[in-house]
């Protein structure tokens, strides 16, 4: 058989190398936000977004929005546009002058989401807050089925799991005592919580999160000394009981102190304390300080707020005895925008020489100055993020996974819709670098396969679980990350009922993923379970049932394909088509050679016959 002319090795291998190059490099990171408000809300994009939660247990997060001072509207996620529809409404018009907060949770342990509202009562003469719980029934709320709590609060309460039964409890100072009280979920009984000489700061930024590295949530309090100096207290959970662990002061430079936030800022697997504030009362000079876990030292991670000759700063909180709109303190909202494993933040900044007020992304980047060398990371204001800088008079900005794809998008509230209501803006994150993530939600574990109506309670908003992972990054180094679930609930904390942990551009399996939950009084053993070889770009739903037998806990894994899956498929199909083309060409050339050889044989036969 004669051989035809074969393509060169370079020609054969070129597309294969091209496909591999595409896979290894991936698309270049792009940073842009696309406004999808009309697609999500239609004409209903107004009201104060107050909380997130899955009310109807369909594995999609719903939005809790306050309107007209006293109405709560629940926008249920839907499969068709507009993707969030106002389906459930409860009103406090007969009780309230102004609803101030919304905290979804399962307050009676029936695995159905209930909703706690705090409000200023009508004709209120002081700043005491009333509270009411609307009880969930059949994956919705019954406006007539509610319980008005028999005590009022000095400030918005912290929702936590005080007794470790995974039914949310209500912590705060009430009209009955100057000492913190706890309303236990389930039987709704009042009990003393702690004995302390400190006064609670108003507005507080208490938190229920593990700060002592034992996978059990501790109690963090923002308090005042007898001389009204700001301080912070950590009450450690020891055997299910809270004992004072440490007390520390604010950074000495700060005059205006904002709300504490918690994040694994430097990616070491431990919680760090972030504190925004100002070094003068008018916030002409703003800063963000960080205290690393266990150090007791404040380190500045952002002090540069100038952009092209314009100085920006935080918006100081103005305390009103009888506010007409929801008070919004100086707050950072935390989320990993670019999935690099280092949490970023959203903040509202004001032009110090004008009146413009905007939302800005604070990106977590490697430290480039001497002041933050200890933590190796710092915040950098992203001044020109397309889409975000078009929204004027912003008052709140937070992260939210709009499309349930593991990428955190942005929601901004801005003034000017009406006198009493604000506009909602939703911005899709078009960050195209093919980074990886794992999305974790820990349920209450009050039931497993025996849940009422066979519906797993995906939407109970469980405070207190702690999550940590270890993996190997793209350079072969060990990488850790951690997060607490629903650690803060007051003053528009707007925390998500799940955690999205960025993994960077490493496609390696998570070597270990740990989940810990609170434990009851008297229980010495830590409630913690480990899972290994978790696939990146997956959602892990953890059901800690039964609570006291971690080895029996179950986890459901749902995969979310990334861009690289499509890229791999395209490259593979391209290589296959090219190989088929080569085979076809070789087959055609071989057929031509065979025909030529047959003609030559026939010609030789005729010649011999002559």
Curated annotation (Swiss-Prot):
Residues 1-32 form the signal peptide. It holds the Pfam family C2_ITFG1. It is found in: Secreted; Membrane. The chain crosses the membrane at residues 565-585. Its main location: secreted. Gene3D superfamilies: Integrin alpha, N-terminal. FG-GAP repeats lie at residues 98-135, 153-183, 256-291. The keyword Metal-binding does not apply. Glycans are attached at residues 35, 123, 138, 145, 150, 175, 241, 351, 369, 480. Modulator of T-cell function. Has a protective effect in graft versus host disease model. Belongs to the TIP family. Interacts with RUVBL1, RUVBL2 and alpha-tubulin. This is T-cell immunomodulatory protein.
């Amino acid at each position: 058989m004669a051989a035809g002319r074969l393509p060169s090795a370079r020609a054969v291998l070129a597309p294969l190398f091209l496909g591999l190059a595409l896979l290894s490099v991936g698309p270049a990171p792009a940073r842009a936000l696309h406004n999808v408000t009309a697609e999500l809300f239609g004409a209903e994009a107004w009201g104060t977004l107050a909380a997130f939660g899955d009310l109807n247990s369909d594995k999609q997060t719903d939005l809790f929005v306050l309107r007209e001072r006293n109405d709560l509207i629940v926008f249920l996620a839907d499969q068709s546009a507009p993707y969030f529809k106002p389906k459930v409404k409860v009103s406090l018009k007969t009780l309230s002058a102004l609803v101030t907060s919304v905290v979804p949770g399962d307050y009676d342990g029936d695995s159905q989401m209930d909703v706690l509202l705090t409000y200023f009562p009508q004709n209120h003469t002081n700043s005491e807050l009333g509270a009411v719980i609307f009880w969930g029934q059949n994956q919705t709320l019954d406006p007539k089925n509610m319980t008005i709590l028999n005590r009022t609060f000095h400030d918005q309460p912290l929702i936590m799991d005080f007794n470790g039964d995974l039914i949310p409890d209500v912590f705060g100072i009430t009209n009955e005592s100057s000492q913190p009280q706890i309303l236990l979920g389930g039987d709704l009984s009042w009990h003393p919580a702690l004995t302390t000489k400190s006064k609670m700061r108003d507005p507080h930024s208490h938190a229920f999160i593990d700060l002592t590295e034992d996978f059990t949530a501790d109690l963090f309090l923002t308090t005042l000394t007898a001389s009204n100096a700001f301080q912070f207290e950590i009450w450690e959970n020891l055997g299910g009981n809270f004992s004072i662990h440490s007390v520390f002061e604010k950074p000495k430079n700060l005059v205006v102190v904002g709300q504490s936030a918690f994040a694994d800022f430097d990616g070491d697997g431990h919680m760090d304390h972030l504190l925004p504030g100002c070094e003068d009362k008018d916030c002409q000079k703003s800063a963000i300080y960080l205290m690393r876990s266990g150090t007791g030292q404040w380190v500045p991670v952002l002090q540069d707020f100038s952009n092209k000759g314009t100085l920006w700063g935080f918006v100081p909180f103005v305390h009103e005895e009888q506010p007409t709109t929801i008070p919004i303190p100086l707050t950072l909202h935390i989320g990993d925008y670019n999935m690099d494993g280092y949490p970023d933040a959203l903040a509202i900044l004001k032009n110090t020489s004008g009146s413009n007020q905007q939302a800005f992304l604070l990106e977590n980047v490697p430290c480039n100055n001497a002041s933050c060398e200890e933590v190796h990371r710092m915040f950098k204001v992203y001044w020109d993020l397309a889409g975000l800088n078009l929204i004027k008079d912003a008052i709140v900005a937070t992260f939210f996974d709009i499309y349930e794809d593991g990428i955190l998008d942005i929601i901004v509230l801005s003034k000017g819709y009406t006198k009493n209501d604000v506009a909602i803006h939703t911005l899709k994150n078009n960050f195209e670098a093919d980074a990886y993530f794992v999305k974790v939600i820990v349920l209450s574990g009050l039931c497993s396969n025996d849940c009422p109506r066979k519906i797993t309670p995906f939407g109970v908003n469980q405070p207190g679980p702690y999550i940590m992972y270890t993996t190997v990054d793209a350079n072969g180094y060990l990488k850790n990350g951690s997060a607490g679930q629903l650690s803060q609930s007051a003053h528009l904390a707007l925390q998500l009922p799940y955690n999205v942990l960025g993994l960077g551009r490493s496609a390696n399996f998570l070597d270990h993923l740990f989940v810990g939950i609170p434990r009851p009084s008297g229980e010495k053993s830590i409630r913690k379970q480990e899972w290994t070889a978790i696939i990146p770009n997956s959602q892990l739903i953890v059901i800690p049932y039964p609570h006291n037998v971690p080895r029996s806990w179950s986890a459901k894994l749902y995969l979310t394909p990334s861009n690289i899956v499509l890229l791999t498929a395209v490259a593979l199909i391209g290589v296959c088509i090219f190989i088929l083309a080569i085979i076809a060409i070789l087959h055609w050339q071989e057929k031509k050679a065979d025909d030529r050889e047959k003609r030559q044989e026939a010609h030789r036969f005729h010649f011999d016959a002559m």
